[in-house]
Amino acid sequence: MGQPGIDFPGLGVGLVILRDGKILLYKRVKAPEPSHWSIPGGKVDFMESTAEAARREAEEETGLEIRTVRLLGPAEVLSQADRQHWISLLYIADDFRGDPEITEPDKLSDFGWFGRNELPQPLSEFARAAIDFLGDTDLR
């Protein structure tokens, strides 16, 4: 049948997590875009809503308890280097509990809170798309 994102376009989600005008970014270990800074996210499971998938993936990757998510917009990434194609819905959350941590060291190696003028490089295409959706009042 094949693998989503590799043999045919995959459906994914990403979650922008904001605190005090800063975005939470993680450094990826694996494809797509290894060594790039990105937002938490992943694939949507069968019969799972995209909002629930965004919450689940973010909780698994960050250790945070995500309370509410709101739709931010769509993103599409065609990574020629990794031969992956993902169509994702991006969500945003500023209502959460806990402190972020690295819960999946095989997937993510570092994290931090970043303002618009201190974004780490290189940024993943998903992170760039998410940041483009944010206004100056969201990300300072």
Predicted regions and their residues:
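A generic structural micro-feature
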Residues: 5-9, 36, 81-87, 105-108
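Short, charged/polar surface micro-motifs in flexible loops or helix N-caps
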Residues: 18-23, 31-33, 45-46, 77, ...
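Short connector loops at helix/strand junctions that flank enzyme active sites
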Residues: 10-12, 18, 39, 66, ...
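Active-site-adjacent beta-strand/loop module that shapes the phosphate/pyrophosphate-binding cleft
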Residues: 75-100, 130, 134
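Conserved N-terminal beta-strand and adjoining loop/helix that marks the start
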Residues: 1-23, 74, 92
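A short coil-to-beta-strand element that immediately follows conserved catalytic motifs
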Residues: 65-73
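Conserved Nudix-box catalytic region and its N-terminal flanking loop in Nudix hydrolases
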Residues: 22-60
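NUDIX/MutT-family hydrolases
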Residues: 92, 101-133
